[in-house]
Amino acid sequence: MQLDEQRLRFRDAMASLSPAVNVITTEAEAGAAVSPHRPSCSVTDTPPSVMVCINANSAMNPVFQGNGKLCINVLNHEQEEMARHFAGMTGMTMDDRFGLSGWQKGALGQPVLKGALASLEGEISQVQTIGSHLVYLVEIRNITLSQQGHGLIYFKRRFHPVMMEMDVVA
């Protein structure tokens, strides 16, 4: 199998994973940056830590590293349009994306998206280069949770809502 064919098959296989849609934000001395639904996952709960992967060629990396902190905003099913803006699917500029309503400052001063299912603010503890991406290990310092809304995932290169079953009260 050719290397290019293997890469394409790998990408197609990864499109079968269904991660939650996240918007990663940072704002401090090095500037402001927003990264659309990047893969992130829990590493450990002691200390609470996650990993975030960003393409090594992204112009946002110096901003994330310079600020040393970020926020992972887990979008709810009603925030698909916002996810499309941040993914560059609508032609909206980066400055305009931050100009959208719904942002507030979190405990660490990071942009927290109102209505997100969860917002996890943390400090970047390590950055490693693995292939074409930088892997950020982030120690979580502040967590905001919402009891409202359903999930939003990205599966087979499309957004999909994930609805919770509701208990029926007799």
UniProtKB/Swiss-Prot annotation:
EC number(s) from the headed UniProt entry: 1.5.1.36
InterPro entries: Flavin_Rdtase-like_dom (IPR002563), HPA_mOase_red (IPR011982), NADH-dep_flavin_reductase (IPR050268), Split_barrel_FMN-bd (IPR012349)
GO molecular function, one term: NAD binding
Pathway field: Aromatic compound metabolism; 4-hydroxyphenylacetate degradation; pyruvate and succinate semialdehyde from 4-hydroxyphenylacetate: step 1/7
Catalytic activity: a reduced flavin + NAD(+) = an oxidized flavin + NADH + 2 H(+)
Gene Ontology biological-process entries: benzene-containing compound metabolic process; pyrimidine nucleobase catabolic process
Induction statement: By 3- or 4-hydroxyphenylacetic acid.
Highest taxon, organism lineage: Bacteria
Pfam families (alphabetical): Flavin_Reduct
Keyword Oxidoreductase appears in the UniProt entry: yes
UniProt keyword annotations, A-Z: Aromatic hydrocarbons catabolism, Flavoprotein, FMN, NAD, Oxidoreductase
PANTHER family in UniProt: FLAVIN REDUCTASE, FMN REDUCTASE (NADH) RUTF
Family: Belongs to the non-flavoprotein flavin reductase family. HpaC subfamily.
Function: Catalyzes the reduction of free flavins (FMN, FAD and riboflavin) by NADH. Subsequently, the reduced flavins diffuse to the large HpaB component or to other electron acceptors such as cytochrome c and Fe(3+) ion.
The protein's assembly and partners: Homodimer. 4-HPA 3-monooxygenase consists of a reductase component HpaC and an oxygenase component HpaB.
Protein name in the entry: 4-hydroxyphenylacetate 3-monooxygenase reductase component
Lineage: Bacteria, Pseudomonadati, Pseudomonadota, Gammaproteobacteria, Enterobacterales
UniProt gene name: hpaC
